[in-house]
Amino acid sequence: LDYKDFKRIKFDKQFPNPFNYSWMNIDSLFLMRPSDYPSVKNILKSIQSWDRVASADSYGAGSYAVLYSKLRKYYNKLPDPKIFTTSVLNKALIEALEHMEKYFGTTKIKLGSFQKLVRGDKELSIFGLPDIISSMGSAPYKEGMRKVVSGESYIELVKFTPKGVEIESIISYGSSDHPKSKHFNDQ
């Protein structure tokens, strides 16, 4: 494993195929035929054809993120082993579409339009979803969006070479917690 491969793995934004959640099963989502669910066929196609990369500019990731946020209310009602049925998934897909239409005026949004990194008055489109290596957890924000509240934060990569130590580091937002500091949101 070389340094380039290590960085590729560290910053991987892709879900496995099939999903491999340890706490829920949504495999039925990929068995649903869009033609059997005309009211949600477009969002269903978007998710099913998605490459499972949670990049900020991905429409499939945007559709999946909105659906994922709608599944939360159904999760606790499911008996163990927490298998989402097509009936529950259809309801959640309808809610996801309604959410997109209400807040974004469309049924097709990029992940970065739905999910933001927020610090002070700075708001950035952000990659990532829960349960990938470069995971991002989010909470309700404003105007139908979500903001990242956990996940990638301070990262330091250290490489020991014959010429000495090489360090790469980044911290989300900035190096100060003081809103008036120029380093509050400069990274």
Describe every region a protein language model picked out.
Residues 7-187:
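Acidic, low-complexity N-terminal propeptides/linkers enriched in Ser/Thr/Asp/Gly that mediate export
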